[in-house]
Amino acid sequence: VLHRCTGEAPVIICCHGLFSTMNSDKFLKIAETFAPEGFAVVRFDFGGCGESTGDIADTTVTSRLEDLEAVVQYLSGEGGLTGRYGILGSSFGGYVGLLHAAKNPVAALSVWATPCDMLSIAGNIPKADMQKLKRDFFIDARRYDLLGAVAGMPSVQVLHGASDEIVPAEQARLIYQALHDPRDFLLLPQADHSISQPSPRKQAITASLAWFKKQLLPGC
């Protein structure tokens, strides 16, 4: 789903988490907030999630990178866009977004509740969810070194809940420490993994909007 704004605009691609969808309240609110501020916003479902085709059991880091690359390719043929794009990724969506940015010209990123080591947090995810995935997910995940991929990467904002029950805040700090300026770090007190409470969520959206304006909109 492409939310357009008035005039030519940079795009913010929203990448949802491992078992989430593009229609989560979080991403609907992000699109609603960003579009009037000079951004086109894209929401999409990774394969096997929400309205997409495929089976969640076939999900891997590699498959999600391929899905994201397909979205970027699609946008390159759309009119009314500047060609510059940012990524706002939540949890596994942030992980995938960072890996994509390591090999592609992403202008800026904001990653929420994002792990630096997917395998280390698997035990914190509900067992019923993890059982939906094949062994291939874990084999594929071992191929990727997120901290190595983002070492020296600029223009990334890291947001994390201090009460995240899935991804320890220390993983967010490790990501931030690996980055290069300009970068930003925001720890949200009392916020959970989904940043589900109204006040922290509003704070996160406001902070991300300000970050993307600074990085992508001249004069802001």
Regions found by a protein language model. Give the residues of each.
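Short alpha-helix in the alpha/beta-hydrolase fold that links the catalytic acid
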Residues: F27, P168-Q177, P200
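Short beta-strand/loop motif that positions the catalytic acidic residue
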Residues: G152-M153, Q157-H160, D164
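Acidic catalytic loop of the alpha/beta-hydrolase fold
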Residues: S163-V167, S194
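Conserved alpha/beta-hydrolase
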Residues: A31-T53
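Alpha/beta-hydrolase active-site loop
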Residues: D58-G79
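Catalytic histidine-centered segment of alpha/beta-hydrolase-like enzymes
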Residues: A191-A204
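The serine-hydrolase catalytic nucleophile loop
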Residues: F19-A31, F46, E170
